[in-house]
Amino acid sequence: MKLYRTFIALILFSFGVGALQAQTPTTSSQAQDCGHFVQQFYNWYAATENASMKRNSPGSALEVTLREKRSSFSPELLKGLKEDLAASKKSPGEIVGLDFDPFLNAQDIAERYLVGKITPKGDHYWVEVFGVWNGQKHSNPDVVPELAFENGHWIFTNFHYGKTGIPVNENLLSVLQGLKKD
């Protein structure tokens, strides 16, 4: 009888573990899903930016993005970007706030963008994004978005630009905070 109970307990335990594993995506599948989200965003954003340039309306891609893709950004990042955009609109003709594209870490747009290495860091993922210029992928990432999976979807929480001699310029949140102080 004792052997029978042990056998039944093992069967129930194995079904329970299997069900839990089926509900929890693996780190590998999460990373792939995250990378797919980032690639889709950059495909959309590059097309939006190109359309803005053709209309001779630089900067409007950021406005369109904040309007149409706001659910893709953390509240902190969205607030900082909206505040920066509002400050720059108050002083047309002057460079106020961000003087580069915060999602591309550039002033010009590449032909296209490719997702590279995806690195889990705690409950966030850092995704390398490379610009392709004249058919050649940059050897170093142009930008490294940081993402989290919240409320059933991916959101950008920051954009990293690499090490510089000025640490405040190494990521979008710190750049926005520095500009707000100025």
Task: Write out the residue ranges for each language-model feature.
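Low-complexity, intrinsically disordered terminal/linker segments enriched in charged
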Residues: P120-D142, E150, T157-D182
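Surface-exposed, charged secondary-structure patches
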Residues: T24, R70-Q136
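Bacterial Sec-dependent signal peptides at the C-terminal "C-region" and cleavage site
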Residues: V17-T26
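Surface-exposed patches in mature extracellular/periplasmic domains of secreted proteins
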Residues: E49-P58
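Bacterial N-terminal signal peptides that target proteins for export
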Residues: M1-I8
